[in-house]
């Protein structure tokens, strides 16, 4: 305490230093408007990071994300996918590649030169409710057409340790 008094006395006179009283917290306009307990203060000079309306998605040309929101699945008479009775107007053919997660990661990097043969490729993921205990990784690949999917499967060499499942996805 004596060192603090000595340091402060070098810049201030002794009547400005109070050793027995505590200082009142100073408030600013920003702290008066918002509760500071448990919340972050918003920076006014930056745009709101939660507002995604200014960014356009790069997936607009893909069949998976081009379906308008709010509509449910409906039956169509000209549905090309015979595996289901109910088809959406916008479905995307997919392939699930299943196997060891590290092998799938390496396969994803090996498939980058073939990106014109697919629309989107997911990161390696797995089902969390799997009771078996083995962590089989899954990579989902989407296509714009079934022809593109077939061309991908005919062109790309998939390792024999990776299981291939085909299907469709609608959002």
From Swiss-Prot:
A GO term from the CC aspect: host cell nucleus
Any Pfam family the entry gives: PPV_E2_C
Keyword Cell membrane carried by entry: no
Keywords of this entry: Host nucleus
GO molecular function annotation: DNA binding; DNA-binding transcription factor activity
Cross-referenced InterPro entries: E2/EBNA1_C_sf, Nucleotide-bd_a/b_plait_sf, Papillomavirus_E2_C
Location relative to the cell: Host nucleus
Biased composition (Polar residues): 28-38
Region ranges (Disordered): 15-54
The keyword rRNA processing is annotated on this UniProt entry: no
GO BP annotation list: regulation of DNA replication
Family classification: Belongs to the papillomaviridae E8^E2C protein family.
Function: Plays a role in limiting the replication of viral DNA in keratinocytes. Recruits the host NCoR/SMRT complex to viral replication foci to mediate repression of both viral replication and transcription.
Identification of the protein by name: Protein E8^E2C
Source organism of the structure: Human papillomavirus 58
């Amino acid at each position: 305490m004596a060192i603090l008094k000595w340091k402060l006395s070098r810049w201030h006179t002794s009547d400005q230093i109070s050793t027995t009283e505590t200082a009142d917290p100073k408030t600013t306009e920003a702290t008066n408007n918002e509760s500071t307990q448990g919340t972050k203060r918003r920076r006014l000079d930056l745009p709101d990071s939660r507002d995604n309306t200014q960014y356009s998605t790069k997936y607009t040309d893909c069949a998976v994300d081009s379906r308008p929101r709010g509509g449910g699945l409906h039956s169509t008479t000209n549905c090309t996918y015979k595996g289901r009775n109910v088809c959406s107007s916008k479905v995307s053919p997919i392939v699930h590649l299943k196997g060891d997660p590290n092998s799938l990661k390496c396969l994803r990097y090996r498939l980058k030169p073939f990106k014109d043969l697919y629309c989107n490729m997911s990161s390696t993921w797995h089902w969390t409710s799997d009771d078996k205990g083995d962590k089989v990784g899954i990579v989902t690949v989407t296509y714009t057409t079934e022809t593109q999917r077939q061309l991908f499967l005919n062109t790309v060499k998939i390792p024999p340790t990776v299981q291939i499942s085909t299907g469709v996805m609608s959002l």
